[in-house]
């Protein structure tokens, strides 16, 4: 049996596939299998995969009708014989030491999950958020805590997360084929809470090719009108899975905060009619899965409670409009807070390694206390940060959205 099974979904990638497979065949760890899943690709991708398979017996080609990325990955998972699973999109590629480094992390930590860093191709993404999430720090979680999902650079791309095959089989974990976009986000919310040990490593082992102009990702990135309903579908799938597994009591406030942050910036850029439609759909989902969605959101900040209350009232038909102040208050809260923290981080990171971090934390606390509306939630956050003796490292630690 191979140590690593690499699942490569294939669809319309004839331009990139040969290079991708060459990097997999060149891995320094030789004990691998490469499972190419041809998802009904109409171009010459299947023939390219078969040609590589004729040169390397470690390559297997599975042909199936088109079913989407999740369907292709699941077919690869079901066929895999290795101890560990990795996922590589067929227009991307791996560093030659990737499999060896991942296996080392699994075995040295007895981990169920290993998440690693990635480079963008070309190197400059011009996207601070993307650079952040592709740069995890070195850290091992021996049990699940909410920070793994919400404070680490641990999401949302499945291709930079490897899993122990026995772990996902034992928990019957697969990609959700009902989610046509954002399945990686759902997958991470599924796997992290169930893992005994998760290892994050800062090594950048994957090369992520930035989206082509004609790709689904490009359409997604450039259209809030298209993106928000898809994001709501992602939230619905995550909450459904958590409800089914009895996980909703793990971290309801942190989960709600992430959901609203995930959705609201784009949502309030839509037309009023689109906002009402999306908020009503969101309200129905939140009311179905949270014991008291409004109270949970209000714990974060009052405007968050207002957003959830409005969404639920739109969903059940008890209101038909959106308060004019809702978007304005949300923007003041989020954008004002971000500007304040960004200023603090810039000053903090401009210092040398012996900078007065404690002083900076105290200064920020004082500023937040002067903003009466922000004080309760954010001063508490700084106190927690200090008590955990953890501050972001300049080079490789950032928060994932």
In which residue ranges do the predicted regions lie?
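Donor-binding/catalytic cores of nucleotide-activated saccharide
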Residues: 69, 90-226, 232-233, 246, ...
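A conserved acidic beta->alpha catalytic loop
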Residues: 23, 38-48, 65
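Short aromatic/hydrophobic "clamp" motif used to bind/position activated sugar donors
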Residues: 85
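N-proximal low-complexity "stem/linker" segments adjacent to membrane-targeting elements
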Residues: 1-25
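Membrane-interface aromatic/basic loop that binds lipid-linked glycans or pyrophosphate carriers
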Residues: 269-401
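Short beta-strand/loop segment that forms part of the nucleotide-sugar
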Residues: 31-40, 60-65, 89-90
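Cell-envelope/extracellular polymer assembly enzymes that use nucleotide-activated donors
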Residues: 2-5, 33, 186
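Glycine-rich, basic loop-to-helix element that forms the pyrophosphate-binding segment
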Residues: 64-80
């Amino acid at each position: 049996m191979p140590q690593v099974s690499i699942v490569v979904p294939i669809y319309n990638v004839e331009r990139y596939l040969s290079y991708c497979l060459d990097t997999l065949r060149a891995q320094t760890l030789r004990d691998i299998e490469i499972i190419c899943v041809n998802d009904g690709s109409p171009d010459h991708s299947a023939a390219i995969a078969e040609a590589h398979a004729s040169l390397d017996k470690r390559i297997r080609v599975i042909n199936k009708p088109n079913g989407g990325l999740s369907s292709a990955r699941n077919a690869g998972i079901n066929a895999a014989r290795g101890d560990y699973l990795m996922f590589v999109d067929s227009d991307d590629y791996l560093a030659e030491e990737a499999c060896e480094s991942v296996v080392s992390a699994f075995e040295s930590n007895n981990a169920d999950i290993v998440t690693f860093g990635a480079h963008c191709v070309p190197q400059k993404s011009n996207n601070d958020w993307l650079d952040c999430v592709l740069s995890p720090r070195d850290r091992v979680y021996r049990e699940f805590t909410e920070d793994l999902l919400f404070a680490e650079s641990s999401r949302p791309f499945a291709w930079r997360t490897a899993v122990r095959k026995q772990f996902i089989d034992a928990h019957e974990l697969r990609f959700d084929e009902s989610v046509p976009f954002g399945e990686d986000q759902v997958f991470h919310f599924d796997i992290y809470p169930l893992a005994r040990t998760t290892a994050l490593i800062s090594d950048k082992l994957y090369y992520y090719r930035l989206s082509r102009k004609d790709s689904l990702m490009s359409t997604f990135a450039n259209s809030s009108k298209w993106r928000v309903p898809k994001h709501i579908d992602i939230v619905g799938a995550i909450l459904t899975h958590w409800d089914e597994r009895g996980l909703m009591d793990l971290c309801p406030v942190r989960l709600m905060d992430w959901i609203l942050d995930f959705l609201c910036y784009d949502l309030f850029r839509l037309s009023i009619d689109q906002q009402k439609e999306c908020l009503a759909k969101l309200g129905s989902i939140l009311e179905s899965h949270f014991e008291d969605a409004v109270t949970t959101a209000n714990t974060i900040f009052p405007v968050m409670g207002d957003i959830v209350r409005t969404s639920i009232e739109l969903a059940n038909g008890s209101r038909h409009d959106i308060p004019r102040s809702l978007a304005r208050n949300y923007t003041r809260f989020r954008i004002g807070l971000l500007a304040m923290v960004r200023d603090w981080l810039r000053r903090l990171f401009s210092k040398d390694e012996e900078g007065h971090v404690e002083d900076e934390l105290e200064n920020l606390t004082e500023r937040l206390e002067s903003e009466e509306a922000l004080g309760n939630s954010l001063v508490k956050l700084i106190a927690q940060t200090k008590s955990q003796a953890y501050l972001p490292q300049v080079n490789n630690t950032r928060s994932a959205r």
